[in-house]
Amino acid sequence: MPKTRRRPRRSQRKRPPTPWPTSQGLDRVFFSDTQSTCLETVYKATGAPSLGDYVRPAYIVTPYWPPVQSIRSPGTPSMDALSAQLYSSLSLDSPPSPPREPLRPSRSLPRQSLIQPPTFHPPSSRPCANTPPSEMDTWNPPLGSTSQPCLFQTPDSGPKTCTPSGEAPLSACTSTSFPPPSPGPSCPT
């Protein structure tokens, strides 16, 4: 039989002692000890007092302020009178009405734009001599109007349009073309 070499057993007593308890029953003590040690170290490093030096104050005294002298102007009711008046005005039988909200437009109605487009009025039936040419140049017919071009009948010729060079009667001297012609229509004086 070959000889087996025997290994010498190390005894657990020769191991260097650990700084914390090793038994499982003392786990609670281990955690609390380490926590308090760490906290104490951190507090000391930042300059705060350690947990061991902390003494809880027995009683904190709140300062007593004397009542304020009444500074109100003569003729002004006191707060007690105001609160009594408010209490008497509110009836306890009916609950206070909620604040009324402005009526919201329904979703079915089309939303009105905040900026209204300008409305153009057709020129009045004044003679053209009194109307300055700037008004006639800037007037545009409404979009939905079905007005026809400015046609008029003269006894000697057929239908004729109002042109700057042509002569036209006083009643038919407004330009309805869109956009307006560059030189304004001239009217006979």
UniProtKB/Swiss-Prot annotation:
Compositional bias per record (Low complexity), positions renumbered to this chain: 80-94
Induction remark: Down-regulated by P30II.
Residue list for modification Phosphoserine: S70, S177
Residue positions, PTM Phosphothreonine: T174
Polar residues biased stretches: 143-164
Positions of short motif Nuclear localization signal, and RNA-binding (RxRE): 2-18
GO (cellular component) term, any one: host cell cytoplasm
Domain of life: Viruses
Biased composition (Basic residues): 1-16
Purpose: Rex escorts unspliced gag-pro-pol and singly spliced env mRNAs out of the nucleus of infected cells. These mRNAs carry a recognition sequence called Rex responsive element (RxRE or XRE) located at the 3' region of the long terminal repeat (LTR). This function is essential since most HTLV proteins are translated from unspliced or partially spliced pre-mRNAs that cannot exit the nucleus by the pathway used by fully processed cellular mRNAs. Rex itself is translated from a fully spliced mRNA that probably readily exits the nucleus.
Domain statement: The RNA-binding motif of Rex binds to the RxRE, a complex secondary structure consisting of four stem loops and a long stretch of stem structure, present in incompletely spliced viral pre-mRNAs. This region also contains the NLS which mediates nuclear localization. These overlapping functions prevent Rex bound to RxRE from undesirable return to the nucleus. When Rex binds the RxRE, the NLS becomes masked while the NES remains accessible. The leucine-rich NES mediates binding to human XPO1.
Listed name of the protein: Protein Rex
Species the sequence originates in: Human T-cell leukemia virus 1 (strain Japan ATK-1 subtype A)
